[in-house]
Amino acid sequence: MPEPTTDTPGIPEEEVAACVGAWWREGGRGDQVAFLALADDHDASAVVRDTHAHVPGSVVVDATGLTADQTMQQALTALGVDLSEDKREDWRFALGAWPEERLLLVVNAHRAGPTRRSHEPERLVTRTLRHLARGKLAVMIHVVPRLLPTRADPKTVFRVSAPATEPTVAPDSAALRALALAEPRLVPLPVWAQLVTALTGEAASEDELTEFAREEPGILRLGPLGVSFVDEGLAETLRRETESADLLRVHGHLVTWLMRSAPDMRHPEGWARRGAVGLYAATGLAMHAVQAGTYGEVLRDGRVIANLPQTALMDAARSITFRIPGNTAASDAIHLWGWGVTPRHQTEWASWLHLMALSRDDLEVASVIASSGVALPWQAKWAHWRPPGGYHARFLQPGKFAALTEVRWQGRPTIAGLQQRTVNGEQQLYVSIWDVETGDHVAGPWEYDEIPQEHRADLTWTASSGNGSAAPARVRELFAASSPRRDNRAFVLPCAPLAVGDVVVFAGDLGLIAIKPADGVDIADFGARLRPLSGDYTDAGPCRPIDAPAPSHEDLITLFGEDLLYPIEVEDFPDRLTHAATRELLLDFGLPYMNEGAMGLFPFGNWEIGILDELPSWPEGIDPVPESGPFFQIGKWMGGKLVIDGPTGHVLRVPTEPGQDHLAGLPVAHSLEAFLTMVALFVTGWRSRDSAPPASSEREQISYWVLGALAEVDETGGDQPAWSYVLHNT
């Protein structure tokens, strides 16, 4: 058979099926991706249908309007793969277990996604379908030239020559040109009228547009929910011919009109359930806003985002950039997607958006979401946790929870949490007490089995506990009847949920939150994880409290607690450490006692070193540094000594031997204050990464968030390889 390349003419349409059939019969095509490349306006349905007939056992999926995840779901279902909840993770094994190879044909990949500007076509072609081609399954994708990967093997590209047929003749009509600028492909008549008004500056009659559609049945299809093009290729051609100024004006007008119409689209289940216009707005508003340059404003409007699907928020953001800024509903959507939180109903998705806004203290947006008209099935009462995508010391303050039980503290309903933390490399259990109504931390941590004598009168059992005594005497009694922890892989917060009054408390390694369900709503499965078949969507920036000050050395108090920060005693302070700001910080604030992330800081020394041991000069054989010393050791890092230069206050890492350029850290920071700020950022990232799902993209993203944050504090020190070496190799 011919082997088409970029230098060879296209294959005549009538010969494509035979060429693909011959290619397939050669065998050994499993886990390959091939491409059927046709011109943008070329209808591929006949070509794919004929190809399907030439390859026995092949399956065809039309990607038009589908997300990459929906396309993958349809494909696997058509191939007979079991996608039931307990089997869906095994789809990769299923593809490799077939006795013979099979071919999946995906048509209209360039029309994937619910909107015309969607990023889904690129995602489908460059990522999703490549991951699907494995084992005994090969995938052939119908693409247009702009989507054909530049590194595609020419032997797997079947370029189809355009047929010698007359193109569709369409009337020169402003109404037709305006309709092509819609984002969803099915357009309600009121929306079409607004598109015409935006393009021409003149009012348009819905009756006249209806009559126009009826007069052009070969071009337009009229149905109960609106009008669409018979040949989507014509719409794509008209869009390409539109001036950029016209595009900006039309999209801006439509965003304004849809936002103004929001009160009329209110519905307990979201805009999409309020007629054709509501469905159009829910599907297309975000992408119109992208092209109007107002997507940032949309993301700050809780009334709007409560009605926009998770995929619409992600798709619109990704169509702008591959690096999605953090602290927005779009980044929330991406982080939750990566954790496997993909609610099926808009109402539940709005509840998650409310929780994420509340988690970063964006109370204004949370309040507007709650009053958006969407009937939230549950609302977060308070949240003390590291939300998916969270990167801030404050998010880590509540700690990790292993079990919960209900108690009373001074008569008030409270939660006792069995918690765990790592101290000097060892797991340590402790107990804390939390107020159910306010979420306040009211007592603890208690690190030993005995409940402190001074608190025994404050802590009592509930009246319904069934315990023989009025109050527990030991910590172990608190959790004797606790329900077992659920599967870590199946739930975001795997501790058994605990109902207290009108709220249900959930906890786990991420922290603790209280959820108030609506009447009659069962939220036992809150936080259930169902990882999307198509995998991670894209990278997004971190989530932080909106009122958080700039990073500071004082963040170490949040991370370690004041009891693990040790100022240096005056009598222990070396005279030759003369840098004034460094002396003041060490005497007043001190250093944390830590051994974490291959770094140890020892404010009172350890078995190897004393307090601020002096290193009189830089070791011989090690590349010299501008600092003259003497140097004073505060700890160790990746085997090397961490020292402070006495005259300048610079913090340096002393390599253990020559030739350690990949671990050089000179200087680590230009001041002790900057170094301690960087330590806080590093430890925050280290602990946050530990709480992310194994093998998740968030674990890798956190490493880059940390490196970026370090460079903002000290550009030179943050760029030193030892930071990244630890993050990427441990």
Feature-to-residue mapping (PLM):
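Sensor-1/coupling segment of RecA-like P-loop NTPase cores
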Residues: 41, 123-154
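A eukaryote-biased feature capturing mid-to-C-terminal, repeat/solenoid-rich segments of large proteins
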Residues: 169-174, 226-228, 235-278, 292-312, ...
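P-loop NTPase Walker A phosphate-binding motif
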Residues: 21, 37-60, 142, 146-149
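C-terminal boundary/linker of central alpha/beta nucleotide-binding cores
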Residues: 172-240
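Conserved P-loop NTPase "ATPase switch" module shared by AAA+ and STAND
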Residues: 94-122
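A surface-exposed partner-binding patch
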Residues: 512-517, 521, 527-642, 713-730
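Conserved NTP-binding/hydrolysis module of P-loop NTPases
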Residues: 68-85
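Long, low-complexity, intrinsically disordered segments enriched in glycines and aromatic residues
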Residues: 473, 591-716
